[in-house]
């Protein structure tokens, strides 16, 4: 099995830590004035989603994770599973709620998602960075009500709740960043 040295560490690198695939979120090489150099890393476990900070001594090796990312198109959902289709082979894959996490609120028909497979099983689903959704419920924006610049909550067609500016009305289509859950703009 392949392995990576701390010299190879960079954000996005996937490796095995405590028997679970992880991805490096941040890393920093530290050379203290006294003592051995080390690499300070922030990792996210792909199955549990936990974020940890771990220090590796300089030159330490870690086992590479046999993790593969594939592009799939969201098809439909039943009681227990969400189904995705490969755009070229038309092969379908089912994903359970644990692998999907809270990303189900960003799934719309035909959305291009990245599914991460480990040992042939789906362990995570990454929705597109931006989605366009309809506002189905929000408070009316009152004229002159600008004391709080935080906006107002709006419920979208998938059930997600985001903060939107006061001028957004029910029925409008808005663009949302799925990574942060923030309103980006209205769609013309």
From Swiss-Prot:
Q: Which GO terms describe its cellular component?
A: cytoplasm
Name a Pfam family for this protein.
Answer: EFP_N
Post-translational modification note? May be beta-lysylated on the epsilon-amino group of Lys-34 by the combined action of EpmA and EpmB, and then hydroxylated on the C5 position of the same residue by EpmC (if this protein is present). Lysylation is critical for the stimulatory effect of EF-P on peptide-bond formation. The lysylation moiety may extend toward the peptidyltransferase center and stabilize the terminal 3-CCA end of the tRNA. Hydroxylation of the C5 position on Lys-34 may allow additional potential stabilizing hydrogen-bond interactions with the P-tRNA.
Output the CDD domains linked to this UniProt entry: S1_EF-P_repeat_1, S1_EF-P_repeat_2
Q: Where in the cell is it found?
A: Cytoplasm
Q: What is this protein called?
A: Elongation factor P
Function, in words: Involved in peptide bond synthesis. Alleviates ribosome stalling that occurs when 3 or more consecutive Pro residues or the sequence PPG is present in a protein, possibly by augmenting the peptidyl transferase activity of the ribosome. Modification of Lys-34 is required for alleviation.
What keywords are annotated for this sequence in UniProt? Cytoplasm, Elongation factor, Hydroxylation, Protein biosynthesis
What lineage is this protein's organism placed in? Answer: Bacteria, Pseudomonadati, Pseudomonadota, Gammaproteobacteria, Pasteurellales
Gene3D superfamilies reported for this sequence: 2.30.30.30, Nucleic acid-binding proteins (2.40.50.140)
Q: Which domain of life is it from?
A: Bacteria
What is one process in the GO biological process aspect for this record?
A: peptide biosynthetic process
| Functional pathway | Protein biosynthesis; polypeptide chain elongation
Q: Which protein family is it in?
A: Belongs to the elongation factor P family.
Q: Which PROSITE patterns match?
A: EFP (PS01275)
Listed InterPro entries: Elong-fact-P_C, NA-bd_OB-fold, Rib_uL2_dom2, Transl_elong_fac_P/YeiP, Transl_elong_KOW-like, Transl_elong_P/YeiP_cen, Transl_elong_P/YeiP_CS, Transl_elongation_fac_P
| GO MF term list | translation elongation factor activity
Organism name: Haemophilus ducreyi (strain 35000HP / ATCC 700724)
SUPFAM superfamilies from the UniProt entry: Nucleic acid-binding proteins (SSF50249), Translation proteins SH3-like domain (SSF50104)
Residues modified as N6-(3,6-diaminohexanoyl)-5-hydroxylysine are: 34
- Asked whether the UniProt record includes Cytoplasm among its keywords, one would answer yes
């Amino acid at each position: 099995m392949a392995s990576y040295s701390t010299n190879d560490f960079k954000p996005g690198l996937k490796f095995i830590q405590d028997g679970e695939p992880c991805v490096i979120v941040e890393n920093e090489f530290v050379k203290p004035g006294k003592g051995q150099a080390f690499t300070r890393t922030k990792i996210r476990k792909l199955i549990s989603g936990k974020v940890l900070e771990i220090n590796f001594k300089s030159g330490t090796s870690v086992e590479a994770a046999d993790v593969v990312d594939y592009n799939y198109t969201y098809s439909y959902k039943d009681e227990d599973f969400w189904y995705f289709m490969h755009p070229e082979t038309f092969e379908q894959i089912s994903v359970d709620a644990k692998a999907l996490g809270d990303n189900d609120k960003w799934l719309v028909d035909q959305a291009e998602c990245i599914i991460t497979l480990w040992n042939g099983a789906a362990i995570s689903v990454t929705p597109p960075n931006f989605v366009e959704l309809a506002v189905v419920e929000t408070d009316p924006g009152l004229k002159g009500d600008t004391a709080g610049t935080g906006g107002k909550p709006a419920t979208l067609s998938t059930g997600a709740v985001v903060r939107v500016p006061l001028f957004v009305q029910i029925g409008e289509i808005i663009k949302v960043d799925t990574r942060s859950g923030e309103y980006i703009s209205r769609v013309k």
